[in-house]
Amino acid sequence: MRLILAATTTALLTACGQASVPASERAVVTAPAEDARILAVLSYASWCGSCKALDPKVQAVQEANTFDGVTFARIDYTSRSADAFYADAETLGIGETMRATFGDTIKTGKLYLINLETGEVISTVDKSMDEAAITAAITDAAALS
């Protein structure tokens, strides 16, 4: 009985914690740099296994390289609130692009390389790619814009 009570309490606390993530912790969202041509935006959630695999690779690539005209951002979908996700996308100037990409089904665990002038998703990076492939995808996207 105690085991059932403990499991139920843990599940409820976890669910409540995910539903009430404050905006300040929900996303790393700032406007892209003025000279940015490409926005590399990670669709992320703390419960997403693909995110946990991809995020450290993206961070390592960011730290090891300088990409002219590329701004990195993360939109956190941990709370599973589409309204909050799309509000953060609007802050980045890519609300329309994200709505066209996802519709009602937001997918996490991918880095979207978006041309800020056209709103086009140039390329998508996923967890299967190593750091060299991620670097190449970002470099190629920057060269196209």
Residue spans for each PLM region:
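Non-catalytic, surface beta->alpha helical segment in thiol-disulfide oxidoreductase systems
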Residues: 105-145
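Bacterial signal peptide processing site
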Residues: 17-19
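C-terminal motif of bacterial Sec signal peptides marking the signal peptidase cleavage site
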Residues: 12-15
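Thiol-based oxidoreductase modules, predominantly thioredoxin-like and allied folds used
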Residues: 67-91
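Short, internal strand/loop/helix patches
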Residues: 86-117
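Sec-dependent signal peptide recognition
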Residues: 1-7
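Typically the conserved alpha-helix immediately C-terminal to a functionally engaged Cys/Sec
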Residues: 52-66
